Amino acid sequence: MKQLIIISLLIPLFTFSQLKFSDPESQGISSDRLKMITELSKSYVDQGKVANITTMVNRKGKIIYFESFGNRGLDDKQKINKDDLYRIYSMTKPIVSVAIMQLYEKGKFHLNDPVHKFIPELKSLKIAITKDSLVDAKNKITIKHLLTHTSGLSYGWSRQPADSFYRQADIFNSESSDDFIKKVSELPLRFEPGSKYNYSISTDILGILIERITGLSLSDYLEKNIFKPLGMVDTFFQVPTKKASRFLPNHAYDRLTKEINTIDSGKYEDSKKIEGSTMRNFYDVKMYSGGGGLVSTAYDYMVFAECLRNNGEFNGERIIGSKTLKYMTKGHLPSTVQGIGRGESPDDPAVSARTFGLGFGIINSPEILGVIGSKGIYSWGGAAGTIFWIDPVEEIVVVSMIQLMRSPWTLRNDLKVATYQSIVDSFE
């Protein structure tokens, strides 16, 4: 059995040549116990909880697990391939955060610089006290506020006074980056910049900041400074028509009917059908969303994540300094706003177990969180259920991809259990 596992791990070498593959035992992992990921994945697919799942596990720079299960979609019974393309949505954010910090390293700005130094449209903003009462913000949004989601900006998801303005503005149907900024400049903040944490469009603003500083489109900047150096050939904002057959359908869980429906076929010929909806069009992109616009493969994202695990370098290409990356993956929220969560419940102990760095969520206490792992794990996920995490203690990197919006499942935590229970030689 062990021989079969080793052979299956060697097969991808002919197709996926950048990352190094190894048998699990040589990396302190049990092959037999690693099967738990396979059993978990098949269970989710067989129960119809997800159409498919692709998962990669890396330890000490070697791939010890790379498998895909399921079909392309619930309405597309073609078997999934390992190089199929996923919408990674907010897993775009860590990439853009690294990109902006490349410019920081070049001395283009300081973290406490006000954003309006480069985007003057955002100089004079207001705060929504109620829907009918706006007051001038006393503080200016800084670049660090954007990186830590303490800017006061929003997504418009909640019922706070400012959020109704976001929903009306329909900012993600903007014709360009400038149009997006114009709309945002007319929206009120939720709170004084720097005073609270609120997950928001901050990284979209960072993407536009990159464009303003460099004169390049965000797409061109990422291609030149991250994707090309790392050999990430399947990561982009706009799906090339020649790769359209690999772009997977997207699904959503309906909490009322408890059904899962296809909401985007992923097909080029159907792309016009989602214009004007809340879904993004990945074929006719008008604005490059730094907060959620990228499409990628599990393999490509593993290359990026392995580069981070290896202190900013991959295959001899360094995209960011080791010290800079360590700085980014420390907790940066002040004690007054320590802890992150969807809601605003600082008394929730699970919230205190997490904090936020410069573009990454960080686990302070897996014990309080109640999920196996190590202190210092940094990670992020996407709206369609994608997830990655890097464990500096155990030298483990996991990338897992599905395409399911509003997932009610505990797949991410289940995957952590399945991964960590396979460790034979722990470094902790």
Question: Where are the language model's segments positioned?
Answer:
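Short, conserved phosphate/pyrophosphate- and ester-handling motifs at nucleotide-, phospho-/glycolipid
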Residues: S30, K93, T297
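Short, well-ordered beta-strand elements
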Residues: F388-I390, E395-L404
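Short, contiguous pre-domain boundary segments
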Residues: Q18-S26, S164-R167
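Active-site SXXK
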Residues: T38-S41, T55, G61, D84-V115, ...
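Short, surface-exposed loop or secondary-structure junction motifs
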Residues: L125-I372
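Short, conserved catalytic-motif segment at the N-terminal edge
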Residues: S22-I88, S124-T130, W409
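Bacterial Sec-dependent N-terminal signal peptides
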Residues: M1-K20
